[in-house]
Amino acid sequence: LRCLVGSEMCIRDRPEEGTNSSVLGPFHISGSPDLPIGGDLKGDWDGEVVLFKGRILDASGAPIAGAKLDVWQTAPNALYSSQDPNQDTYSFHGVQTVGSDGIYAFTSIRPVAYTVPTDGPVGEILNATGRHPWRPSHMHYIVTADGYRELVTEVFPDDDPYLDQDTVFGVREDLVMRYQPQDSDSFPDGLALSGKISGQWSLVEFDFVLTRG
């Protein structure tokens, strides 16, 4: 089922010492715009503001300068931009290039859980097996760097009710992270949304580890 829903790629075997992969899914768009370090994906959408930050590292823990992070997610209406004619083509899509420190950082809003399309063979399989069509909320990532294996993965919140029953079996233990609640006074400087946040926001910290190709 995970191969039918994420038709461009099944989950790959985990590289030794690297971050686990997960499903690509059918909603990735090539050519996403550059997302500066500290940039924002939420735009004018309402929702829980989240700062996603971390590093892109090699298996020894050294930062990988120039690595690219291609990120995308659903809008608050549970639709990807390619499913929703009311969204811009690259809504909630961006590509960030890290510097010599390997650090990435961007803001967005918390993605929501959604149902996979249930028409066609996927729906038939779900009906035959008695499974629901829900996926837990998640952020999608493709992480690339010269000389390293491409990583296609997802990162999930630890409090999602569908975490243990993902209909495409994409959840891996090391891909589950806590959305850490923060006060507005603690929002960092130097970000696109600095000085614009009122109320609580969340922090998600996650390091990606790539292995040599």
What residues fall within each predicted segment?
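Exposed aromatic-hydrophobic patches
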Residues: 103-109
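Short, ordered, surface-exposed loop/turn motifs in non-cytosolic proteins
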Residues: 62-75
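Beta-strand-rich structural segments
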Residues: 47-62
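Extracellular beta-sheet/turn segments enriched in Thr/Pro/Gly and aliphatic residues
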Residues: 37-42, 161-213
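Single conserved hydrophobic/aromatic residue that forms the stacking wall/gate
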Residues: 1-6, 10-11
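A short, solvent-exposed loop/turn motif at the edges and junctions
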Residues: 110-153
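Short, acidic Ser/Thr/Gly-rich low-complexity loop/linker segments typical of extracellular
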Residues: 78-103
